[in-house]
Amino acid sequence: MAVNVYSTSVTSDNLSRHDMLAWINESLQLNLTKIEQLCSGSVYCQFMDMLFPGSVVLKKVKFQAKLEHEYIQNFKVLQAGFKKMGVDKIIPVDKLVKGKFQDNFEFVQWFKKFFDANYDGKDYDPVAARQGQESAPVPVLAAPVLNKPKKPLGSGNTAPQRTVPVQRTAVSNKPPAQGISKKPATVGNGDDESAELIQQINVLKITVEDLEKERDFYFGKLRNIELICQENEGESDPVLQRIIEILYATDEGFVIPDEGAPPEDQEEY
């Protein structure tokens, strides 16, 4: 039977998005590039097969799943494996199959702790186990429009209005400047250069989208922590005061702009 893991808190043991993908790819010999690709459920099914041979029917897993109903079928296989091995964790299938970063990142953080608690180090050939199949890339969803908060952080009737200072770095969608040697005009030369630049732009856009999702994910957690601190601000708890100090700390020389002040000259894009 499996060793259950109930801790879901953020600790120093949690892996970053990049480290998590590296662990998955190395363990299962895959080439995942985004956390969102875990929404198919096939990765978890194979990890269960690695941890507890025979706990899941691996031939029922659709490693090339591209549609939501196929993802759901994979998670049903995973749920059956959890039940067989006595795993108490409830799988939020309806959220995971939507392919959103935050839901999938939270679940894989828990699963990594579960894996570490149960892995005995035995040899496992992941490619042979899945008969050479590779996980299909998840269709790229349109990037959501980031809604600006209607009220600044710290607004409320129970506590003074304060904001968590967030230093933002302007992200340019321009590709990095590269020295392009001038060549004599030849047939197709311009098309090749244009295609290469377009590819670079697309890669940068995907990187920006990933960074924005990750930023919003951790920003939401900081916001929740701030609300809890504000609700208990009247208490003389040294730990609470220390948390508040960390939340509102700024880098040396950083100044929070006054509301209503004319904006400074900004870089034009």
Curated annotation (Swiss-Prot):
GO terms for biological process: attachment of mitotic spindle microtubules to kinetochore; cell division; establishment of mitotic spindle orientation; negative regulation of microtubule polymerization; protein localization to astral microtubule; protein localization to microtubule. Keywords: Cell cycle, Cell division, Cytoplasm, Cytoskeleton, Golgi apparatus, Microtubule, Mitosis. Residues 14-116 form the Calponin-homology (CH) domain. It comes from the Eukaryota. The keyword Ligase does not apply. InterPro entries: CH_dom (IPR001715), CH_dom_sf (IPR036872), EB1_C (IPR004953), EB1_C_sf (IPR036133), MAPRE (IPR027328). GO terms for molecular function: microtubule plus-end binding. Pfam families: CH, EB1. GO terms for cellular component: centrosome; cortical microtubule cytoskeleton; Golgi apparatus; microtubule; mitotic spindle pole. It is found in: Cytoplasm, Cytoskeleton; Cytoplasm, Cytoskeleton, Microtubule organizing center, Centrosome; Golgi apparatus; Cytoplasm, Cytoskeleton, Spindle. Its main location: cytoplasm. The keyword Nucleotide-binding does not apply. Gene3D superfamilies: 1.20.5.1430, Calponin-like domain (1.10.418.10). Residues 186-256 form the EB1 C-terminal domain. Residues 168-190 are annotated as: Disordered. Belongs to the MAPRE family. Plus-end tracking protein (+TIP) that binds to the plus-end of microtubules and regulates the dynamics of the microtubule cytoskeleton. Promotes cytoplasmic microtubule nucleation and elongation. Involved in mitotic spindle positioning by stabilizing microtubules and promoting dynamic connection between astral microtubules and the cortex during mitotic chromosome segregation. This is Microtubule-associated protein RP/EB family member 1. It comes from Xenopus tropicalis (Western clawed frog).
